[in-house]
Amino acid sequence: MIATQTFVSVFFFVFFLVSLPFFSSAAPPSSDSIYESFVQCFSDKTKSPQAQITDNVFSRTNPSFSSVLRAYIRNGRFNTSSTPKPAIIVTPRSDIHVSAAVTCSKSLNFLLKIRSGGHDYEGLSYISDKPFFILDMSNLRDVSVDIADQSAWISAGATLGEVYYRIWEKSKVHGFPAGVCPTVGVGGHISGGGYGNMLRKFGLSVDNLIDAKIVDVNGQILDRKSMGEDLFWAISGGGGASFGVVLGYKVKLVPVPETVTVFRVEKYMDSGAVDMVHKWQSVGPKTDRNLFLRMLIQPVTRKKVKTVRATVVALFLGRAEEVVALLGKEFPELSLKKENCSEMTWFQSALWWDNRVNPTQIDPKVFLDRNLDRANFGKRKSDYVASEIPRDGIESLFKKMTELGKIGLVFNPYGGKMAEVTVNATPFPHRSKLFKIQYSVTWQENSVEIEKGFLNQANVLYSFMTGFVSKNPRNAYLNYRDVDIGVNDHGTNSYEEGEVYGRKYFGDNFDRLVKVKTAADPDNFFRNEQSIPTVLSKA
């Protein structure tokens, strides 16, 4: 496991000696010599003058190094003085740059961390306890929308906000099924499955892929045809960073109505919250597939009393009167009225889901703001529920949450299109579940003791939920990265270590992912603390 709080420079020095056998042990490589070797290699591969390369390759002595590093760190837990830092950051501006970064990192025997938007909850895209470089994809942000073909090519460094904005520029009746956080990077989001508030209608992001481009371990730039269907399948939900560097995806755009409806309804423990959450389990995953009913559950203090607030946040691909009539029959506990609803365009609903004030009036270009160098402290975990939690289970859950005080839950319903896709169509295996749970705790204080307290809250609630969630294995969602469920040191037991978390993320699809990994990257160059191992590492 990454030990960001205890990492010390002595260990980093030792890792340099061990990991770079081509340098004399009597004269360990300096950061300058590593940088010079990389720049020379990069120049040779890209046919670029070394003077031009300095704008895209940053050593630790570069005045811009710290700002480039911090820009896409989205979790303050991994932005401390003791957090391991890369020897070099590469910010490619072309596919050739990416290819060169791969081959040069490999030749220098440095681990390559691939960062798109920086939203990896455990920071695995930009930290390591081994000597490493960062490949920061943020400059590769092209989004080319073809409305006639109802498709778009999206570069890995683009954000979801940029994707939605570029679609909106071309059409008010097209969208793409992906997440609600506009600063999330496309590369990690889609390669890990990708979901949003249209998943019950259109499935996951990876259910809407046409093509992809990737740089493989040999620096080759491959599309779907040249990489083959096995590798294309693997990077369609199995996590791209285990197999290469995803350059981009060609996706199918989906039709959305001119007018959609959003609403938010909240209740507290003394006003029907338990009944609402209990009933939600039988409605959310089974209702009209045009309706997505997210459930937020949060401990709060109200009128000086600790309680729990349950909030339904919804998107309906249709008019307000339709959804009010529908839920009047299916979910009377919600007490939904038309005045609770707001009608708007699909793009405006994306702004609303991002908690923007007056989404029908705001400048759409706010989705082009990447909010750089801004990070709270946080921890996320995930679970899947296959059968409804009984009412007394909901009551006991609320009691436990009030005791803990901070940790919240998000229930995301499945059903609809999700239940129609076979379990092995993509690496994402959780199709038949009723809903997914996200455990979420966020704080602002930079304190080791405060962090320990909140991490403990997450672990206590996760343990409490054991009897209500999936078993053998206890499933998890790759894009809600959680190192508590297992990590890989990539030593002699790499396969066995990888199987622990791999089965939780991918179920039986883990076996095929291992085979693809072994064929595509037999020496395991592309690796992180939760990557897919090779079959060659099986004891």
UniProtKB/Swiss-Prot annotation:
Cited SUPFAM superfamilies: FAD-binding/transporter-associated domain-like
Gene Ontology CC entries for this record: apoplast; cytosol; plant-type cell wall; plasma membrane
Subcellular location: Secreted, Cell wall
Positions of glycan attachment: N79, N340
Signal sequence, renumbered to the chain: 1-26
Cross-link annotation 6-(S-cysteinyl)-8alpha-(pros-histidyl)-FAD (His-Cys), location: H119-C181
EC number: 1.1.1.-
FAD-binding PCMH-type domain segment(s): 82-256
Similarity remark: Belongs to the oxygen-dependent FAD-linked oxidoreductase family.
InterPro entries assigned to the protein according to its UniProt record, in alphabetical order: BBE, FAD-bd_PCMH, FAD-bd_PCMH-like_sf, FAD-bd_PCMH_sub1, FAD-bd_PCMH_sub2, Oxid_FAD_bind_N
Cofactor stoichiometry and binding remark: Binds 1 FAD per subunit in a bicovalent manner.
Protein name (Swiss-Prot/TrEMBL): Berberine bridge enzyme-like 21
Keywords on record: Cell wall, Disulfide bond, FAD, Flavoprotein, Glycoprotein, Nucleotide-binding, Oxidoreductase, Secreted, Signal
Post-translational modification as stated in the protein's UniProt record: The FAD cofactor is bound via a bicovalent 6-S-cysteinyl, 8alpha-N1-histidyl FAD linkage.
Required cofactor(s): FAD
GO MF annotation, one: FAD binding
Enzyme class: oxidoreductase
Cystine pairs: C41-C104
